[in-house]
Amino acid sequence: MTREPRPEDRFSFGLWTVGWPGADPFGTASRPMLDPWQYAEKLAELGAWGITFHDNDVFPFDADETTKRQRVDRLKQAADSAGLVIEMVTTNTFTHPVFKDGGLTSNDRGVRRFGLRKILDAVDLAAEVGASTFVMWGGRELSLIHI
């Protein structure tokens, strides 16, 4: 028996769950990355209700403001056209090497300031795209203490 998702099921998917390029500690990426709007369109075809994403799922870590704006606008347009809700936005303060000691817990004041600015920018992004939830996941915060 196959069950098709319905909008009232409110299935949402993180773009990182489908956009992951297959890299791991033992090897480099094994499949190409698609643009986030391509994932959004496909998820809508499969019956998704909404999407969630990290800031850097939409634009590269080192993107300039023009590139960020273009990519956010394109994703928002794709989500709206497909009838998808952008349910949650979060920020990535753990992947880039600058955050090796955490975005908010680094001993380096400059890294903490940068991490906080990145988080606040992502809060604004969440509000802009209509997300009802913002998550600050501290993936590397105090990570050595937890080993």
Predicted features, each with a name:
Residues 1-133:
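N-terminal pre-domain/capping segments
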Residues 138-140:
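Short, structured patches in soluble enzyme cores that scaffold and shape functional sites
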Residues 145-147:
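Conserved small/polar residues in nucleotide/adenosyl-binding loops
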